[in-house]
Curated annotation (Swiss-Prot):
Record key words, sorted: Isoprene biosynthesis, Magnesium, Metal-binding, Thiamine biosynthesis, Thiamine pyrophosphate, Transferase
Protein name, as recorded: 1-deoxy-D-xylulose-5-phosphate synthase
EC number: 2.2.1.7
Cofactor: binding comment: Binds 1 Mg(2+) ion per subunit. Binds 1 thiamine pyrophosphate per subunit.
Assembly and oligomerization: Homodimer.
Protein residues bound to thiamine diphosphate: 72, 111-113, 143-144, 171, 278, 360
GO molecular-function term, one example from the UniProt record: magnesium ion binding
Cofactor(s) this protein requires: Mg(2+); thiamine diphosphate
Organism: Campylobacter jejuni subsp. jejuni serotype O:23/36 (strain 81-176)
Biological pathway: Metabolic intermediate biosynthesis; 1-deoxy-D-xylulose 5-phosphate biosynthesis; 1-deoxy-D-xylulose 5-phosphate from D-glyceraldehyde 3-phosphate and pyruvate: step 1/1
Classification via InterPro entries: Dxylulose-5-P_synthase (IPR005477), THDP-binding (IPR029061), Transketo_C/PFOR_II (IPR009014), Transketolase-like_Pyr-bd (IPR005475), Transketolase_BS (IPR020826), Transketolase_C (IPR033248), Transketolase_CS (IPR049557)
GO-annotated cellular components: cytosol
Length: 615
């Protein structure tokens, strides 16, 4: 078959069912080929190939809003939308995004979960006000239905009666093992012993019944399917079709045409296999969700093994040690047990650590209640996903001044996932909150010390750490953690000082070493705490060093520069501050090293800028 992928509705309509199936197979090959080289979201995209093809065949992608929840199922859509020639650049610097992106022709940006139905509702309202006949189509996975926002939208959609199609991709998996009553609800009818035996009896009946009775028996079987799975949606006022085989193009196309003709809000419940078409990925929960480059034949990663432990692994081990030492430690993650390292604790202490699915707001508030009851919660969460629970952080933790620990993974630039996932805002949105303490480790030993301190600390506290490994290892001796105390790592008479925070200390040290090779020098401070700052040390520093460079992986606005300038103004100190934090723009995708170079935040670029201040 030609490697050209049909990408218009008209072209797809001309293909036979067999040709469409061949198209699906060739697309799977392409997705596997590209993801094996570039990394990406593999299993979820492989499971949604037929769904995307059917969407493009029944609806008009040029006018009907296609909304992909999270975008983990959008690769086939990209190929059908004419992106075949640049698909090899997926997730690469200046290449095709791994998520939906309006600048690439998609309807809406997506990277965080459970927004699709709300977007569909809003699109419905706009279309109605314009007097147009377009129909929004939202593709959402069963994992995304664990978030409350999806039900807020379904609640309004069912009451609105707008024409809208919600295509539910139920693969009985989210990123990790599915959690909660909703997941169980979606699968219970198909899993019951009664239904399975009933289905077998119907199959035997169909073999012996005359044609006239066969039709009625089939209709009876289909009606039985509706009793349990569809009840939730129908009670909300939505039409319901399914469950149907999400890999049977004929069934999907028929269901979409039926839903389109209804001119009402309709949920089509499809059941798919995550990782379909790549045997090594089928049936796996987390391993093949988001992957790096790998060998297609063996499934083994082709990335050179890093002998250094990741910051996540260090966090996980330290928390295990603390949990065995202090029985009042509890913890939670929102659908990212393996990503945050909390899976090890859930396995060892299932009554003290929980995965609550994609429910960041619930995660934070439930842990606030546990803190109120005398427990010490550790909330393990990606920096970018903490944004989803900001009100709960303020209302339920900060105002109450509760002893809650926020462990913010993936702080700083995270690479190929791009602007929806960069962890560069947490300092800016947490620093203004009264009662909050903020700090960051520079290396493994300091991570251990900070976590021990966080357990003992009174009040809400948050520490951030990077994706991957710490750059620094044992270049500097660790210090005891004391509230609001920094560590002076390199002390001399230079009028220039480097102030580092977290992973920024490593970048500052790399620049300083290059300067020392040129017979230049600078003071190096590990702030450790962003809030409160070590005012005593900084006042001493201001007497000798009049140029301060800030090294921190946060945006400038509300970051370390802002906090330092507030301090200088408070004491009427006159110091020139130069910040190497990120500018006021969203940071796009690409390998972290390439993104840093583009932003002129790599060591060579920073060194060039610093050298201008040496005479």
């Amino acid at each position: 078959m030609s490697k050209k992928f049909a990408h218009t509705q008209e072209e797809l309509e001309k293909l036979s069912l067999k040709e469409l199936e061949n198209l699906a197979a060739s697309m799977r090959e392409k997705i596997i080929q590209v993801v094996s080289k570039n990394g990406g979201h593999l299993s979820s995209n492989l499971g949604a190939v037929e769904l995307s093809i059917a969407m493009h065949l029944v609806f008009d992608a040029k006018k009907d809003p296609f909304i992909f929840d999270v975008s983990h199922q959008s690769y086939t859509h990209k190929l059908l939308s004419g992106k075949e020639e640049i698909f090899d650049t997926l997730r690469q610097i200046n290449g095709l995004s791994g998520y939906t992106k309006p600048s690439e022709g998609d309807y809406f940006v997506a990277g965080h979960s459970s927004t699709s139905i709300s977007l569909a509702v809003g699109a419905c309202k706009a279309i109605a006000l314009k007097g147009e006949k377009r129909i929004p189509v939202a593709l959402i996975g069963d994992g995304a239905l664990s978030a409350g926002m999806a039900y807020e939208a379904l609640n309004e959609l069912g009451d609105s009666k707008f024409p809208c199609v919600i295509l539910l991709n139920d693969n009985e998996m989210s990123i990790s093992k599915p959690i909660g009553a909703i997941s169980k609800y979606l699968s219970q009818a198909m899993a019951t012993q009664f239904y399975q035996s009933f289905k077998k009896r119907i199959a035997k009946m169909l073999d012996i019944l005359p044609d006239s009775a066969t039709y009625m028996a089939k209709r009876f079987e289909e009606s039985f399917k509706l009793i349990t799975p569809g009840l939730l949606f129908e009670e909300l006022g939505l039409e319901y079709i399914g469950p149907i085989d999400g890999h049977n193009l004929g069934e999907i196309i028929s269901a979409l045409k039926q839903a389109k003709a209804m001119q009402k809000p309709c949920v089509i419940h499809t059941q798919t296999i995550k990782g379909k078409g790549y045997a090594l990925a089928e049936g796996k929960h987390a391993k093949w969700h988001g992957v790096g480059a790998f060998d297609i034949d063996s499934g083994e990663s082709v990335k050179k093994s890093d002998t250094k432990k990741s910051a996540t692994e260090i966090f996980s081990k330290n928390l295990l040690d603390l949990a065995s030492k202090y029985e009042n430690i509890v913890g939670v993650t929102a659908a990212m047990p393996s990503g945050t390292g909390l899976d090890k604790l859930i396995e060892k202490y299932p009554n003290r650590f929980w995965d609550v699915a994609i429910a960041e707001q619930h995660a934070v508030t439930s842990m606030a209640a546990m803190a109120k009851e005398g427990f010490k919660p550790f909330i393990a969460i990606y920096s970018t996903f903490l944004q989803r629970a900001y009100d709960q952080v303020i209302h339920d933790c900060a105002i109450m001044n509760l002893n809650v620990v926020f462990a913010m993974d993936r702080a700083g630039i995270v690479g190929e996932d791009g602007e929806t996932h960069q962890g560069v805002f947490d300092l800016s949105f947490l620093a203004p909150l009264p009662n909050f303490t903020l700090l960051a480790p520079r290396d493994e030993q300091m991570m251990q010390n900070i976590m021990e301190y966080a357990y003992l600390h009174q009040g809400p506290i948050a520490f951030r750490y990077p994706r991957g490994s710490f750059i620094l290892d044992k270049e500097f001796n660790p210090c005891e953690i004391k509230l609001g105390k920094a560590q002076w790592l390199v002390k001399n008479s230079s009028e220039i000082a480097f102030l580092g925070y977290g992973q920024g200390v490593a970048k500052a040290w790399q620049v300083l070493r290059a300067l020392q090779e040129m017979n230049n020098n600078a003071n190096l401070i590990d702030l450790i705490f962003a809030k409160p700052l070590d005012e005593e040390l900084l006042c001493e520093l201001a007497k000798k060093s009049k140029i301060w460079f800030i090294f921190s992986e946060n945006v400038k606005i509300g970051g370390i520069e802002s906090l330092i300038n507030n301090f200088l103004q408070k004491y009427d100190l006159h110091v020139k501050v130069v910040s190497f934090e990120y500018e006021d723009k969203f940071i796009e995708h690409g390998k972290t090293s390439e993104v840093e170079k583009n932003l002129e935040k790599d060591v060579n670029s920073l060194l060039t800028k610093v050298l201008k201040f040496y005479h």
